[in-house]
From Swiss-Prot:
The species this protein was found in: Sordaria fimicola
Highest taxon of the lineage: Eukaryota
Its biological purpose: Mating type proteins are sequence specific DNA-binding proteins that act as master switches in fungal differentiation by controlling gene expression in a cell type-specific fashion. Transcriptional activator that induces the transcription of alpha-specific genes.
Family to which this protein belongs: Belongs to the MATALPHA1 family.
A family per Pfam: MATalpha_HMGbox
Localization in the cell: Nucleus
Protein name, as recorded: Mating type protein mtA-1
Cellular component aspect of the GO annotation: nucleus
Keywords, comma-separated and alphabetical: DNA-binding, Nucleus, Transcription, Transcription regulation
Length: 301
């Protein structure tokens, strides 16, 4: 019989009074029990720290990096840097990434239960076509880039052509971009939260893509200030010949903002020529257009 069984049998045979006394004696010999258990408060959930804003290069690299998936990361990074330095869509990339940064927390919270998370790459999948940015499959050939094997056996990224292409987009803001992405298939739960965010003027990011002003186009097409001044007059105008002697008028000056006639580069000779046109009663039908062009004001009538 084990010692435990013997103790139990001995206690069972004791009279009730002795049994209670024995139990009290045993309890007195035991060390005191621990005090009340201290309740540890549960950690208070804290708001997530604001995430770093996504800039244009981060979006560019995320979207086009797969073009060089056959290379290790060490080789891909220089290629991406070279492409970014010559990329013509910096404004578009900055805009797309700014919109994403402003609504990223909403997209993550509202779509937490979705299997397909709205990551930066997923967002760009819909935003890039809307903005008219070149897709992955057309980017390198459209901009004249090619991977060339060098004599030493290494592969380098080289630009073998400089093709021309036109960007033709309408002015757009963040809400317009988000709406067009939805039309293209982007699915967002409880989208009204995102719409409210992008509708707030204090958080809106406006991106303009207006066509060049006709005077800017003219300035870009000529480096001759004399030719620019001569273009202000009809071919047979009496003062047209005088324009050949005015060489101090720079076309970019007339595109600057400020008080007319007070900026550096202002020509009194040019003011005299304009005054002559205004006082000439035999103005041709082209003079109103030429004056509007010179003063950079809209045509009336």
């Amino acid at each position: 019989m084990s010692s435990v069984d013997q103790i139990v049998k001995t206690f069972a045979n004791l009279p009730e009074g002795e049994r209670n006394a024995a139990v009290n004696a045993i309890l007195a010999m035991m060390p005191p029990g621990p005090g009340p258990v201290r309740q540890i408060p549960e950690p208070v959930p804290q708001a997530p720290a604001p995430k770093k804003k996504v800039n244009g290069f981060m979006g560019f690299r995320s979207y086009y990096s797969s073009l060089f998936s056959q290379f290790p990361q060490k080789a891909r990074s220089p290629f991406m840097t070279i492409l970014w330095q010559h990329d013509p869509f910096h404004n578009e990339w900055d805009f797309m990434c700014s919109v994403y940064s402003s609504i990223r927390n909403y997209l993550e919270q509202l779509n937490a239960q979705r299997e397909k998370k709205i990551t930066l790459q997923y967002w760009l999948h819909f935003a890039v076509p809307v903005m008219g940015v070149l897709g992955r499959e057309n980017y390198l050939p459209t901009l004249g880039w090619d991977l060339v094997t060098m004599p030493n056996g290494t592969i380098d990224l080289m630009r073998i052509a400089m093709p021309l292409f036109r960007k033709n987009l309408q002015p757009m803001d963040g809400l317009c971009l988000f709406t067009k992405c939805q039309e293209g298939g982007l699915q967002v739960d409880n989208q009204h939260f995102v719409i409210a965010k992008l509708s707030d003027p204090s958080h809106d990011m406006i991106w303009f893509n207006k066509r060049p002003h006709y005077q800017q186009r003219h300035a870009a097409q000529t480096d001759s200030s004399e030719a620019g001044v001569s273009a202000l007059f009809p071919r047979n105008h009496a003062v047209a010949a005088e324009a050949d002697g005015v060489a101090t008028v720079q076309l970019p000056h007339w595109m600057q903002q400020g008080d007319f006639g007070t900026e550096s580069g202002y020509s009194p000779q040019f003011e005299t020529l304009l005054g002559s046109i205004l006082e000439n009663g035999n103005a041709t039908s082209n003079d109103s257009y030429n004056m509007a062009l010179a003063m950079d004001v809209p045509m009336m009538g």
